[in-house]
Amino acid sequence: MAHKKAGGSTRNGRDSESKRLGVKRFGGESVLAGNIIVRQRGTKFHAGVNVGIGRDHTLFALTDGKVKFEVKGPKNRKFISIEA
């Protein structure tokens, strides 16, 4: 009788659920107050004019207007502002 010994079990095969991070509204897009602009870990993007920052570093619009991305300062930081 032909038999094959059972294979061993593995301890791998798990992965965490994706967090859906990233830019949600791009430069020039119109936004309403409260719209999420970026979901991020840490401050990859900094809050500029008319942009608020949540406790998980989410950037959101404080007023209606258009999204503007800019690089400022000696450390070339990326700022996101809303132009009304």
Swiss-Prot record:
Family designation: Belongs to the bacterial ribosomal protein bL27 family.
This protein's name: Large ribosomal subunit protein bL27
Chain ranges passing through the membrane: none
Pfam assignment, any one: Ribosomal_L27
Species of the source: Shewanella loihica (strain ATCC BAA-1088 / PV-4)
Region (Disordered): 1-22
Protein's GO biological process: translation
Keywords of this entry: Ribonucleoprotein, Ribosomal protein
One of the record's GO molecular function terms: structural constituent of ribosome
Cross-referenced InterPro entries: Ribosomal_bL27, Ribosomal_bL27_CS
NCBIfam families for the chain: L27 (TIGR00062)
GO cellular component: cytosolic large ribosomal subunit
